[in-house]
Regions:
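Feature captures hydrophobic
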Residues: 1-121
């Protein structure tokens, strides 16, 4: 449940940044990508960045340019809410997080997440 709430909030922050942050709009301009963040059990959300805007979907999580697949929702929540970049690297190393698809899109999305400021909640 916490993981679903985190994904919802993340989607809202991405949408808000795409509308209100000049630097974020500049970062996503011209990028057309579909990123899925989900658990190994298949619960998650797709983040679609297209034409300078962000939309989200909770269905059709099989199609993605890149996917971040967490071993479970509790681990994902713990790592993502920590705000610690090293925790993401540790999760990858420990196989608690798997990346699928285009690795460049995976890194681009993590960079986009890093550009979200706390004021954009």
């Amino acid at each position: 449940m916490k993981f679903k709430l985190l994904l919802f909030i993340l989607g809202q922050k991405l949408k808000k940044a795409a509308k209100k942050s000049d630097s974020f709009r500049k970062f996503i301009k011209g990028k057309n990508v579909r990123i899925v963040m989900k658990t190994a059990a298949g619960q998650g959300k797709a983040f679609i960045i297209k034409d300078g805007s962000v939309t989200t979907l909770s269905k059709d999580l099989t199609r993605a340019d890149a996917a971040l697949v967490w071993c479970d929702g509790n681990t994902a929540f713990s790592v993502l809410s920590s705000g610690d970049d090293e925790a993401i690297i540790a999760a990858l190393t420990e196989k608690k997080l798997q990346s699928e698809g285009n690795y460049k899109d995976f890194i681009w999305f993590l960079t986009a997440l890093g550009k979200l400021s706390p004021q954009q909640s």
